[in-house]
Design a protein with these regions (language model features):
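Acidic/histidine-rich, surface-exposed loop or edge segments in extracytoplasmic proteins
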Residues: 57-74, 206-210
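Generic N-terminal amphipathic/basic segments
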Residues: 19-25, 54-63
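Coil residues (strongly favoring Ser/Thr
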Residues: 7, 34, 65-69
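Bacterial Sec-dependent N-terminal signal peptides
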Residues: 1-28
């Protein structure tokens, strides 16, 4: 592999009331390959090795056990169900001063779930692979009418959002029934929606142009939240498992 480094010298001169420009350039071809490794600074290499070993130990810490490999795919999947269920059930405890005591519906984007969760030991590195972004847990108070606007367009966007706490039935491609926590969605009711700031700010168009009654941004990333909750599940003597359910029902015709 070769890279050409050009040093360009610009000479500007003024003569007889006009501008005269002279351009000169020099180049040198440098071979960029393994021969450069011989010039590594020993002190720098020692520092990098130490940091690499430290990071490997931290990411390799086992925090739980997964019974079967969990994959993510739309409109609902074992892994997306697991992640949104944990978010819906446990996120109120991370609200801090907001003192939020419940979650009606949790929403994540499929694009933010970047890896599967393989069967066997779960490491911190596995969770970083699933959720590598610095997205913060966000709490939203939202009227049923606005929530319905968001939910009915999930299919229009190719089922780009995963959720927990809701059930949507589609007939002939259109949402015919929406339930929140087992009850029909009420347009005038205020619901507590928990998501990540990427989505709350309009990411992937999931909640774009949706009006909120109020929002609260936590200081906890979804990744750190997930790591802590998997540790808690493990401490309680349980392993990680998930399966499909009826949160998304698609009927081809009436």
């Amino acid at each position: 592999m070769y890279k050409v480094f050009l040093s360009i010298y610009l000479i500007l001169g003024i003569a007889f009331g006009g501008y005269a420009q002279n351009f000169q350039y020099h180049y040198q071809i440098l071979k960029v390959d393994s021969t450069l490794d011989a010039k590594v600074n020993p002190k720098l290499q020692k520092y990098l090795n130490a940091q690499h070993d430290k990071l490997s130990r931290e990411l390799g810490e086992v925090i739980g056990f997964c019974e079967t490999t969990l994959n993510s795919y739309d409109p609902a999947s074992p892994l997306s169900n697991l992640l949104t269920d944990i978010l819906c059930q446990q996120s109120p405890a991370y609200a801090g001063e907001a003192a939020i005591d419940h979650c009606d519906i949790a929403i994540l984007n499929f694009g933010g779930i970047r890896s599967q969760l393989s069967a066997g030991d779960i490491t911190i590195g596995d969770i970083y692979a699933i959720s590598p972004f610095e997205n913060l847990i966000t709490y939203i108070e939202i009227k049923g009418a606005e929530l319905r606007k968001a939910l009915i367009r999930f299919r229009e966007h190719g089922f780009n959002a995963a959720f927990s706490g809701a059930q949507i039935t589609y007939i002939s491609g259109l949402p015919s029934q929406i339930k929140i926590q087992g009850e029909p969605l009420k347009l005038d009711k205020t619901y507590m929606l928990v998501t990540i700031n990427f989505i709350a700010e309009g990411g992937d168009d999931i909640l774009k142009d949706i009006h909120y009654e109020s929002t609260w941004l936590s200081n906890t990333t979804f990744r750190d939240f997930l790591i802590e909750e998997i540790k808690n599940i493990t401490k309680s003597g349980n392993s990680i498992t998930s399966q499909l359910d009826d949160r998304v029902i698609i009927n081809p015709t009436r």
